[in-house]
């Protein structure tokens, strides 16, 4: 398993898989992994040739800075879990890698942005959609696997 911290290095590492027309799967996470994440990796392995799991605690989806500060980051544990699960690549970028400059863009999510969890966490889904787009741009996956707790995000 290869741990990668930079988008350019990730693209280089995935180039041979692309040239061989292998299917690439992305399992995006914020870390603090558990058996549910491992099950997503296993499902990705069934349907793709290469599995990339990202670990990135995205500051733009936290409305309260204290929540961001308190978010658990057991990186050694997470890496061991992914290695044991047989993940091919772990993409662990820094905040400056994903957000090199301040950004001010908006994705129109329609009314879904303000329903359910969005009603109580203003701006949360903008942050989620921004990082998912950035991860998709970095990995360019054929498949992506999200957990059940991300139901509203999938909508």
List PLM regions with ranges.
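Nucleotidyltransferase catalytic core that binds NTPs
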Residues: 2-155
